[in-house]
Amino acid sequence: MKIEIAKDVLLSGIQKVQNVISARATLPILSNILVEAEQGKLKLTATDLDIGINCAIPVDIQEPGAITIPAKRFSDIIKELPDNSVSISTKKNNQITIETKSCQFKIMGLPYEDFPKLPEFKEGGVIKIEQSTLKEMLGLTSFAVSLDETRYILNGILFKINQNNLTLVATDGKRLAVIDRTLTQNTEKTLSIIVPLKTIQELNRNLQEEGEASILLGNNQVLFDLGSAVIISRLIEGEFPDYQPVVPPASENKISVYREQFLLAVRRAALLATPDYQAVKLEVFKNKLVVSKSTPDIGESREEVAIEYQGKEIVIGFNPTYLIDVLKNLKEEKIRFE
């Protein structure tokens, strides 16, 4: 293999794929990126056997070929190169030469034949959604995913597809996040899958503000084609808990508030929270919300926030982290809660 490529283009490609690589890889080959040069494209692939990601970037190919390169070393070298034009070539003994006009590195790789093959997906049953919409939906649910490994079924987000409706659900047992969006096409049947949190994080990292995402389902696997990258992941097996009985019916006590003002007030109150005294108190009066916090041996705070509300007075306590996670991910200037 022998190629010429711009440093910034190559570095961008490496950064797209290298995050899936585990720091505790069980096999040396899993610490490497598969680099394949063919048909005017450089294809970069990384996997930890549960999730795989690849991307293709433009390149000047003088000799096609393939090799696997240690990901961190590859990234560190490219990042520090002094020139923008980079030449990469390989020899039969898996030695890789990386050079610019004034700098040269020679490092060892591993044979591309040893790299695990990513699953192939049959065409058909593609679900399409705007990338910006999917990114918004993930932002409004991923914070509620459980990090408790003993509750494996909750370590991901439920994707529920019913005709032309996509619902995302996440819960850690203490809070529940649900969001619905309409798809541009109908699906033939109802589908439910649980996508692991690590895959969600990679999706969030690679989703763009423009363009479509295509979702394909395989045998206990899912593929997300984002155009600039393709992410393939195992799914979490099992049945997600029935969340609908947990969602309370509509309440007459509807409060409208400016999101940013409410967020900042909760953040300030949370400054006095401790592990033993976490709750922030919310007192709801007509057109006024009082956010307060009192912690023994620490201190207290009180702040008033203007709201639109004409109902009865309410006093309630919340873990401020749960409120902040929601408020910082919403985009609307004004929000309503019940």
List each language-model region with its residue ranges.
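Structural preference for solvent-exposed beta-strand-turn elements
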Residues: 1-338
